[in-house]
């Protein structure tokens, strides 16, 4: 490709809230530009995992190269970067945006602007993108394009007078979107003669090709046979294959400035290719590195254990394979007295946790139990040491701790007016601090600071049920704050169960402990001796329930006769039960763990 045609390249991404029709629009663009023959088209072309299609969400960012002849008679190359919409995958969004110059903002004309639309738009604005608003689903009877245009102008502050009204489902007005991309989005800039400088956008593992690296060329040219250097990881590799995606891989000779494509080489591990790294030619290196991405930090941790201990090795292998494709997922070995061997895993959020667990169960046929999700706490010890606590069971002696800090989030909630009271009460109950409350048309936009610990359990489910599914929620971790947090242990028959221990705020410890004990009382089967179920903070018991003993009638075989005979048998039974209570083991069934962790308040 010559320098002349860098003006005919457009790199763009599509940002939208879940279900506003982003993947469907991508399908239509692919179809309209004739990139894929009609007989090969399928729904959600760019969502390659089954789980993405089933849940209707995009998890991994994908790219596709479209070739389009515009009304001005010129041929354009459009590189579409499909991005996920969900907050857990915000880092996938940020790296797709960094490789583009513009974005299409897709808003559902019947739903209007949602919380995650906002979050992603702000990311696009941070990346200095030109943004073209697109109103989707205008063919629905409930569509109100004019109201939504006003909303876009009010909430986001974008000029929506030239928003393109489309229906991605029926294919209405898709040509207008392509024209808007060509006319309104800027062309990339780059110098073909300069040393190679490229941004590593993504990498994944392919069984046949090894590690495949997705790059956006800024300056210079990437050719076959070249030796390249990753500047951040400081490693050099040979380039075997270069190509682009027309959803399927297609080989080409070279990638020039402004282009997006992939290469494969002698790279063994995905971990060697850090997203956001700068790639340059080994012989002729560029002097300055690109501003990379932030390292992704795991926010939520939980233990994953195989139901059958024999599956431990398969679980280890499965995790290694998933780690190849998802560098944001981290894990380390841990053992639990109650659950045996397993792993402590770190995730970006709750959806990420669910998806990893579902992929492990589905793609590798494993049966898993997960322990209660927890967040990372910071402990300042009396001797001045700073510790990070990932697992509540490892909490050191409270006497040695000076302060405990927990992560807080800044949450933006958009909800219809009539559910506002319930939403505010929910946030208040979760120790929230109200920051802001605005009205956008008939909807309230509430901004709250909340402790992440309170959100991790079931905040999202509760929010959806309070608002009948209409409220949308988006958050980012803002900072760490000191809190009066205590470790609550659950004791069954005076034995602590490590998998059920958690850190809670002192004010909520009692209600949480009581609820947990009541739940376990119903779930643990009765034994021949009485079992106390207790919640404790340190040595102090804060809640207790008792599982009654099954009683065996030992005097059944005595007909009448002397009372002392019966008493002797009853005393003998009492003796036995006492001994049993001392040495008897209480089996806690699997369901009890799972149900106890899904606890409602």
Swiss-Prot record:
Top-level division of the source organism's lineage: Bacteria
Protein role: Required for accurate and efficient protein synthesis under certain stress conditions. May act as a fidelity factor of the translation reaction, by catalyzing a one-codon backward translocation of tRNAs on improperly translocated ribosomes. Back-translocation proceeds from a post-translocation (POST) complex to a pre-translocation (PRE) complex, thus giving elongation factor G a second chance to translocate the tRNAs correctly. Binds to ribosomes in a GTP-dependent manner.
PROSITE patterns: G_TR_1, G_TR_2
Keyword Protein biosynthesis among record annotations: yes
A Pfam family per the record: LepA_C
One Gene Ontology term from the biological process aspect of the record: positive regulation of translation
GO cellular component, one term: plasma membrane
Binding residues for GTP: 19-24, 136-139
Subcellular location: Cell inner membrane
Gene name of this polypeptide: lepA
Limits of the tr-type G domain: 7-189
Protein name: Elongation factor 4
Similarity field: Belongs to the TRAFAC class translation factor GTPase superfamily. Classic translation factor GTPase family. LepA subfamily.
């Amino acid at each position: 490709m010559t320098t002349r045609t860098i003006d005919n390249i457009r790199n763009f991404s599509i940002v939208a809230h879940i279900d506003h029709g982003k993947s469907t629009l991508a399908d239509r663009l692919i179809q309209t530009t004739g990139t894929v023959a009609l007989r090969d088209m399928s729904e959600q072309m760019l969502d390659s995992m089954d789980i993405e299609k089933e849940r209707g969400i995009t998890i991994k960012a994908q790219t596709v190269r479209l070739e389009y002849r515009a009304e001005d008679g010129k041929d354009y190359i459009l590189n579409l970067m499909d991005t996920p919409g969900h907050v857990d995958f915000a880092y996938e969004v940020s790296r797709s945006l960094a490789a583009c110059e513009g974005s299409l903002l897709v808003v559902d004309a019947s739903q209007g602007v949602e919380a995650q639309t906002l979050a992603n738009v702000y990311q696009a604005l941070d990346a200095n993108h030109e943004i073209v608003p697109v109103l989707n689903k205008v063919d629905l009877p409930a569509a109100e394009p004019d109201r939504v245009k006003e909303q876009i102008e009010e909430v986001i502050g974008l000029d929506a007078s030239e928003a393109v009204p489309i229906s991605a489902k029926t294919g209405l007005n898709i040509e207008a979107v392509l024209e808007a991309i060509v006319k309104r989005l800027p062309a990339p800039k780059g110098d073909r003669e300069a040393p190679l400088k490229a941004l590593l956008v993504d990498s994944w593992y392919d069984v046949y090709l090894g590690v495949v690296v997705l790059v956006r060329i800024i300056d210079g040219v990437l050719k076959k046979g070249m030796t390249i250097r990753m500047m951040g990881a400081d490693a050099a590799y040979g380039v075997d294959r270069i190509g682009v995606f027309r959803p399927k891989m297609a080989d080409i000779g070279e990638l020039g400035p402004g282009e997006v494509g992939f290469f494969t080489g002698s790279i063994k591990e995905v971990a060697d290719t850090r997203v956001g790294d700068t790639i340059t030619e080994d012989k002729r290196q560029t002097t300055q590195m690109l501003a990379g991405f932030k390292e992704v930090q795991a926010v939520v941790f939980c233990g994953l254990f195989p139901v059958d201990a024999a599956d431990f090795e398969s679980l280890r292998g499965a995790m290694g394979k998933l780690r190849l494709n998802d560098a944001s997922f981290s894990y380390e070995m841990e053992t639990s007295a109650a659950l045996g061997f397993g792993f402590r895993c770190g995730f970006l959020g709750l959806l990420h946790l669910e998806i990893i667990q579902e992929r492990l169960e589905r793609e590798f046929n494993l049966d898993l139990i997960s322990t209660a999700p927890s967040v990372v706490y910071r402990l300042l010890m009396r001797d001045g040491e700073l510790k990070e606590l990932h697992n509540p069971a490892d909490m050191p002696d409270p006497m040695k701790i000076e302060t405990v800090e927990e992560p807080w989030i800044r949450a933006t909630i958009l909800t219809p007016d009539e559910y506002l009271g319930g939403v505010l009460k929910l946030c208040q109950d979760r120790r929230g601090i109200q920051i802001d409350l605005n009205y956008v048309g008939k909807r309230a936009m509430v901004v709250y600071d909340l402790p992440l610990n309170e959100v991790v359990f079931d905040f999202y489910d509760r929010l959806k049920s309070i608002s009948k599914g209409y409220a949308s929620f988006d958050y980012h971790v803002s900072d760490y704050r000191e809190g009066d947090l205590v470790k609550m242990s659950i004791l069954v028959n005076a034995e602590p169960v490590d998998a059920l221990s958690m850190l809670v705020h002192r004010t909520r410890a009692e209600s949480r402990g009581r609820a947990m004990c009541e739940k376990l009382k119903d779930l643990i089967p009765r034994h021949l001796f009485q079992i106390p179920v207790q919640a404790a903070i340190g040595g102090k018991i804060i809640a207790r329930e008792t599982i009654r003993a099954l009683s065996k009638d030992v005097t059944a075989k005595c007909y009448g006769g002397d009372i002392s005979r019966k008493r002797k048998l009853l005393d003998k039974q009492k003796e036995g039960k006492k001994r049993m209570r001392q040495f008897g083991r209480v089996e806690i069934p699997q369901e009890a763990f799972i149900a106890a962790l899904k606890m409602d308040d």
